[in-house]
Amino acid sequence: MRMVLSSTAPLRPEARAAMIEATGITGNPSSVHAEGRAAKSALERAREEIATALGAEGADVIFTSGATESAALILGGRDLACAAVEHAAVTAWCRDDLAVDATGRVSVPEPGRATLQLANAETGVLQDLPQGLAASDLTQAFGKVPFAFNWLGIQAGFVSAHKLGGPRGIGALIVRRGTEIEARIKGGGQEQGRRAGTENLIGILGFAAAATAAQNDLDQGIAEKMSEIRDSIMLRLESGAGMVTFPGRESRS
């Protein structure tokens, strides 16, 4: 039994099938001929599917190589605060001066000048994201716990496909429509001029399939079932292993 999927998750069958089918799409999404338009159509359908899974209808979904690149795109060059519990891809760009209490909760006095993860990969702590938060690492929560970008009230979020059973090397940055972002990779103007380079269509279609499958699992109650399994394991460890500490257990769903 595989106990930890925080680092990466096995490729979902739905993602594998979508990627194999995508190898038959030969056009470049930036081309205006028939093959290019077909590729562009597939790309935009995938974008809509991922937006739906994220509850981000009406927001901009910008494809990147993963959450690390997405974090650099939205956090780089900004004077934002974060906590030491964030992933290194976040702390590399921010001041880690936000306080963390004994339950793993983070205090954010100025949300518009801070970034805060929704879920922690090591402790499982879920944060209450304040309205107007500048950005959030949604990677560990996406596909595992129910949420919708639109009701989180944040300005931007980022995710990676491989955390929920999609392929490695593909992710997305989600921002409120019209948000100004300075491209860090410049060239052909892809992704609305925010991230140049021909889109990884095979990876993107695999990402969309995995995101849709993960959302279907959530709709069928997988999060509640996993919480029951987790609680059962914790009780067994506490009863049979002597003194056991579970950091942040008060802050999990």
Question: What does each of the following model-derived ranges do?
Answer:
Residues 1-253:
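Pyridoxal 5′-phosphate
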